[in-house]
Amino acid sequence: MLIDFNEIQEIKIPCMNDGTGMMTVKMYNDENYRIIPTRIHKGGSIGTHTQNSGDDLNYIISGKGKAICNGAEEELKAGVMHICPKGFEHTIIKTGDDDLEMLTIVVAK
């Protein structure tokens, strides 16, 4: 299977999960997983929410931020992956000057 993200329309999402600011994404969805290249822009965050659909894997490509998963804070920077297991609560907050760019994969369970 080949997924061509060049063919997927980019969309802007304000205040994701009652977070702040704007993020830009391209979404691929099927019954087994979602694959979402994501950029969180200046002042942006993904609000605190419970991960109900499956494990949420966020590989950081560039930028800086922090994730808080079930109360534990993690530093986000290029080359690290934040994993929020299904049923856990988390938020992602951009903290650096540049966009926080990540590849999110949600694996249905």
PLM ranges: what are they?
Residues A72-K86:
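Short acidic-glycine-tyrosine-enriched beta hairpin
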Residues K86-K109:
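Ligand-binding loop in jelly-roll beta-barrel domains
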Residues M1-N32:
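A short, N-terminal "cap"/entry segment at the start of jelly-roll beta-barrel domains
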Residues S45-G47, K66, H82, K86-I92:
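Histidine-centered metal-chelating micro-motifs
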Residues Y33, K42, S53, A72, ...:
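A generic "binding-loop/recognition-motif" signal
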Residues H41, Q51-A67:
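Short, conserved beta-strand element in jelly-roll/cupin
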Residues E31-Y33, K42-G44, K64, A108-K109:
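Short, charged/polar surface micro-motifs in flexible loops or helix N-caps
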Residues G21, I36-Q51:
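Conserved short histidine dyad/triad with adjacent acidic residue
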